[in-house]
Amino acid sequence: MSHVAAQPVVRNARWRAGRVVTIAIATMATGLAWLLGRLAHVDYIVDTPIGTRKITLALTIVATVAAGIAGWLVIALLERYTSNPRGVWIALTLVVLVLSIVPVFRTPAQLDTQLMLAALHCVAAAVLIPALPQRHTTATGRR
């Protein structure tokens, strides 16, 4: 009996480990993209309502991890309560991606900074959108 009960625990641990790895990969990818931008002399300076702000590597890493954790929460809820979590996830995240990029181009900054910040959003999305959903039984019992 304990052997049967251990099966879901192992599977859940794999899902969690897979999602942690996904967030780590997204973080490394955005960090690398940020560094490539710096090598290309992008200054990452933006004017905000509270003053001029430099988008640092640390800020990029924290933002990516935060987006990954938020995405994990959303996909977990979708997997629990919807019959098509992957479809809803993809539609929702693409809308969020577009809505996150629009303000980048409305913020006063050099064009190379704006383009690189938009690229950073796309890099994180390129990893998180396809990789966070995991195959398992949904709320309706389907895979």
Task: Name each model feature, range by range.
Residues 59, 63-80:
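Canonical alpha-helical transmembrane segments
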Residues 42-52, 108-109:
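Membrane-interface helix termini and inter-helical loops of multi-pass transporters
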Residues 102-116:
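Membrane-helix boundary connector in multi-pass membrane proteins
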Residues 18-19, 76-97:
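Internal alpha-helical transmembrane segments of multi-pass membrane proteins
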Residues 27-39:
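Alpha-helical transmembrane segments of multi-pass membrane proteins
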Residues 50-62:
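Short aromatic-rich membrane-water interface segments that cap or initiate transmembrane helices
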Residues 1-15:
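Short, Lys/Arg-rich, polar N-terminal cytosolic tail immediately upstream
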Residues 18-23, 123-143:
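Membrane-water interface at the C-terminal end of transmembrane alpha helices
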